[in-house]
Design a protein with these regions (language model features):
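Polytopic transmembrane helical bundles with strong interfacial aromatic enrichment
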Residues: 1-147
Length: 147
């Protein structure tokens, strides 16, 4: 059907998962505020970060990549796959909310309310990207199964 959508949705899922793993790792080593500025770390986007916040820097790069992939997937679904629009639009809304919550986590210096919301929204985003990928696979496998 649309092999591009398969790879876009899988790419979104993979990038969201990798971003979550990095975020959990940062939390577990107590380095969530190793890069205290938002949206960029003190060295900016294109200069190599200092050793103290390289994981946080990579986490933010992955956020940019994941969000971009999710938005591109939603645009593709809007233009080509009407039956996938709702899930991809929901993923786009969730990733936008997640970015805003992440900004609040950093700018409020780990305010408990925002930290407490950040992970569940990420889990919901992961779930929606997983459902998008699985529903598309199911639809394509059942549509080709009976031909």
């Amino acid at each position: 059907m649309h092999i591009k959508f398969k790879w876009l949705s899988f790419g979104s899922l993979s990038l969201v998962y990798a971003t979550m793993i990095m975020g959990v790792y940062l939390s577990s080593i107590h380095k969530s505020l190793s890069c205290p500025d938002w949206p960029l770390c003190p060295n900016g986007l294109f200069r190599l970060p200092e050793q103290g916040y390289i994981i946080e820097y990579i986490h933010r790069i992955f956020v940019i990549l994941a969000a971009s992939m999710i938005y591109i997937t939603a645009i593709f679904a809007y233009l080509k796959l009407k039956n996938m629009q709702r899930l991809t639009i929901l993923a786009s809304v969730l990733v936008t909310i997640q970015i805003l919550i992440g900004a609040l986590v950093v700018t409020t210096k780990l305010e408990l309310m925002f930290v407490s919301i950040h992970l569940p929204v990420g889990v919901a985003l992961f779930g929606i990207t997983l459902l998008t990928f699985l529903f598309f696979l199911r639809k394509t496998s059942t549509s080709t199964m009976y031909k």
